[in-house]
Amino acid sequence: MKKRSGFTVMARLIGLVRPLAGYMVLAIGMGLIGHLCASFITIFGGWAMLDLLGFETPVPLKAIFVCVLVFALVRGVFRYAEQACNHFIAFKLLALLRDRVFRALRRLCPAKLEGRDKGDLISVITSDIELLEVFYAHTISPAVIAALFTVILCVFIGRFHWALGLLALAAYVTVGVVIPLVTSRLSGDAGLRLRTEAGALAGFVLDSLRGLSETIQFGRGRARLDEMNARTDALAGDEARMKRVAGRNTAVTNTVILLFDLAMLLTSAALCRAGKVGFDGVLIPTVALFSSFGPAIALAALGSTLQNTFAAGNRVLDILDETPAVAEVTGEA
């Protein structure tokens, strides 16, 4: 098996999206608007509090209540539409990918497939391709949405003071880029090992079924079952380790978010005490940061979940890139 870097696998998989680029742009636009609506519902709450305390606000109180209601409804509609577009893209591409894999298998038959583990092939065609749904539905558009959302929110918060904008940028980059990269490095090749073991187990089960009569004839049923249980336990152990990594990733992400929220509150309070910003420069940037980690959290979770996906993509690309043992010659007498 050829081992490719995560970026190589990602670039190859993104290249398949080209025929559905319009739907991807639509999903990104709707997702961005939806996340902005969700964040500004909380920001409108901060402006309403300022209005009640007698501070000047950019929007009157009645308009704030109307905007909160409208934004809540729009958020729901756009969230649904974004997910519909993403999953339409994902399942269309999975069908396209399966078609390409079957074409590759026909090209490789029979010489290259004769000695290949049939159970492993079934695992690639079914579960490995199915795992790519995570990449197409929950990775490409969320990454672009997070980048655009970060720019907009950093500019919005930075309008109160440049230091607050830089702090917000550091928060988004840490949660959305640094944490998933570190988690991915710590996971190592766990995802590839898990998918390889899953394929080997599928092959073992298939061989056991096909050789059932011989197993019964030679009284090897108990030994075969013990080996199957041992392989299953090893696979479950690897999966448990990956889930522990995902759990630690979530815990670290939530802790970092709380620390940056506290840092925003303390920094804005210090600037207010120094006369650099008013009370609105404390309240609005703080609640804006509180409510705006959604896109970054979606990326933080990918540090552990994408390990399986990239491993599955690597196994699928192995089949697509495989060269036939014998070149097919047609149309020559």
Named regions from a protein language model:
Residues M1-A38, T57-I64, E82-N86, A90, ...:
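Membrane-integrated ABC transporters
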Residues G6, G29, A38-G46, L50, ...:
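Juxtamembrane helix-loop junctions of ABC transporter transmembrane domains
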Residues I14-G22, R107-L113, S127-Y136, I140, ...:
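An intracellular "coupling" helix at the cytosolic face of ABC transporter transmembrane type-1 domains
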Residues R18-F78, G158-A163, K276-F279:
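Transmembrane helix-loop-helix hairpins at lipid-water interfaces of multipass membrane proteins
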Residues L32-F40, A72-Y80, F135, T139-V151, ...:
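Hydrophobic alpha-helical transmembrane bundles that constitute the permease/transmembrane domains
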Residues D51-V66, F156-A170, V245-N314, I319-L320:
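Helix-loop-helix
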